[in-house]
Amino acid sequence: ADGGISNGSVSLAPRKSELYTTPPQEPTDSWLEHLCVHEFRHVIQFDKVNQGLTKGLSYLFGEIFPIAVFGVYLPMWFVEGDAVTFETSVGHLGRGRSPEFLNEMKAQIVEKGLYSFHKAVLGSNKDYVPNRYNMGYYMVSNTRHHYGSDIWSKAIERSGRRPYGINPFDKSLTLSIGNRRDSLWNTSSFRALFHNPDSVKKANYFYNTKRMLYRDNYSELQQIWKREAANCTHTFDTVPTHNKYYTNYYYPTALGKDTVLAYKMGLQETGSFVMLTHGKEKRITRTGLLYDYKFATDRKRIVWSEYRSHLRWEQAGKMRISSYDIKRKKYTRLRGRNNQFSPFKAGDKWGYVETDRQNRSYLVLTDSTLKHELWRMEAEDNEQFIHPSYHNGKILTVVQAPAGIRLESIDITTHNREKITQDIYYELDNPQPTDTNIIYRASYNGNNALYSLQNGTHKKILDSKFGLRFPSFDSEENRLYFSFYTSDGYKPGTATPQQLTSEAVDYTTYPLADEMAKQEQWQQTFTYDSVFPTRCYNKLTHLVNLHSWAPIYASLSPMEVDLGATIYSQNKLSTLTFTAGYVRQSGYKHGNWLLNLTYSGWWPILSVEFESGREDFQSFADGLNLQTGQKDALYVFNKSQRSSADFVIQFPFNLSSRQYNSSLRPYLRYQIEGIHHQRPKQVYGYELQENTAILYPVQKQDYHIYQANRYYQLMEYGLTYSNQTRMTEQEINPRWGQMLTGGFT
């Protein structure tokens, strides 16, 4: 998919991978290679599970059984932590070498201590808890560091080979560790981390090995990180903010004397631009979804890039340059066919990065109204422009290339490109040119720090315990603004030139990542030496993809499980899904045939639900006595079929914009249900004597019984409309919303 989202996923039922190929504005390895390596690791995990008894039972249940074992036994922090470890160990960068990724756990552990294992795994709406990727990376890699590279592989294999018992995954960890935990805690270097190592070891012990590893790993890392934090002595000023819960302030930028503009997002804020003045905060406007928080301003207007949903297709939305006139309070959005990122001010013009469907990257300049394109430059093959800025007729930008990441200066008039730094496998972004130097963020020292480049010499000028980013230099005040990370989020900071240092650059490695690379013994090198045949994808011939079958029927809507025999199909594009079979379903005493089918490949969504089964019922009927020629009243026990069909056509429209999630869904529904193929099993004569019903047996072959087929039809027209504000982590209900439903039956 070439929409505005940069992501990927792998599923096992059905077995497929989905890659969202638009590269993000993050300096990392080549996006497609990074994405494929991470997602392919999940494929390997699935294959590791699908062996032994699990593989045997997959012949009985199809692909649904391995994914059930996978979901029940493998914790998600391991699944994602292992994939992050692999992407880091075989890549040049990866998240295991990204301070932005690493510092979330560091800040929480150092400043707030260790949360309980359950809180770390399940998360919290009260406190910010780093996600399963962050927590899982340290769990997987640090455990491998102490207990060997195969400890997790054995756990997956045991879960697949023996998917019985309470927890084979945890049992395998227990067997793999054995007495080695005692050996680890007896080493002098490990004991030296703690004041009383024996008491810590005892407190960390749990019968659940995963829980024990969590305590051991993070107790060790806590001591290491505390010492690292104590060695950071840089000082700077903070811009006062007041928040009870976790809140981030991105890209603080001077908006006049004593006024700072920043993008705010947190547990109680979905995303908005705010002005900070003397400790007071004023919201300017809320925004839609931002995946990169970089914005630009000329102090009259704010320009940023936000996600614009497609009217119909979920993955076809684009990143669009949007602007807000502060004085007129007017919101506008730039149109275009491609994704637009990282706006910047270029004199009296505006600029941004554009990425097309082939992942070609462009620098674009427009006039002051953002309506007319004036200048465009295309990057070389496999290059991406990241976080450009402008100074004195030149665009300064980060360039991500296969050989590494570098800074470049591009002359607007001549289109001449000049390398300012050599290609290097460290993160670089947000270059801010001044009259005398270039200030940028880099990960040279294993942390997010600010550096200065002047006359070809790099110097570290500012650092903090858990990193700082998003520099912005105000030439009028001669002051540097930035965001520094804490366990309560990114906070705005500021420094004068006198507070900045001038330290030599220390190119630090990442010990844990390097150790994992040694264990893998493979460096990511892609050689394009083969050409594989391609052919057009035929949607018709690939419409059906049977992936699972089972002697049970399981439905999520409504939630029910019944015995039976069913097959499940979902094609690779997820346009056609259906479940078919014969099940012992509620409402049918003798079982019934069913078919639930949905086709989503066109704008309208077509749904069909069909059920048919035996229906026994009793009824009064008139019968012609073939011997006497009289019409008699009868009471009949019938054997018949009850069938129902429900056809629905929906026309979904996604009207979401800015801070509102909105949808409109007109629909047409036709339903028919009836009782047919009625056959009398037993027939009784019927008489009333003194208000008492008397039934007496008769021979059904003596009567011609009049019974019409029983059925009803329903035609329904209607629409549903929903509109509500996006919700924060802590909100139970939206701040504002409407739900309207109307129809005619």
PLM ranges: what are they?
Residues 127-130, 154-293, 299:
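Beta/coil-rich, acidic/histidine-enriched accessory regions frequently appended to metallopeptidases
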Residues 234, 238, 243-247, 442, ...:
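Outer-membrane beta-barrel initiation region
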Residues 236-244, 280-286, 329-335, 372-378, ...:
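A short beta-strand motif characteristic of beta-propeller blades
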Residues 257-258, 300, 347-349, 392-393, ...:
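Short coil/turn segments that connect the beta-strands within blades of beta-propeller domains
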Residues 96, 100, 246-247, 264-273, ...:
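A flexible loop/linker signature enriched in serine peptidases of the S9 family
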Residues 1-69, 75:
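Juxtacatalytic substrate-recognition/specificity segment
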Residues 609-745:
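Transmembrane beta-strand segments of outer-membrane beta-barrel domains in Gram-negative
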Residues 70-100, 106-178:
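Active-site-proximal alpha-helical
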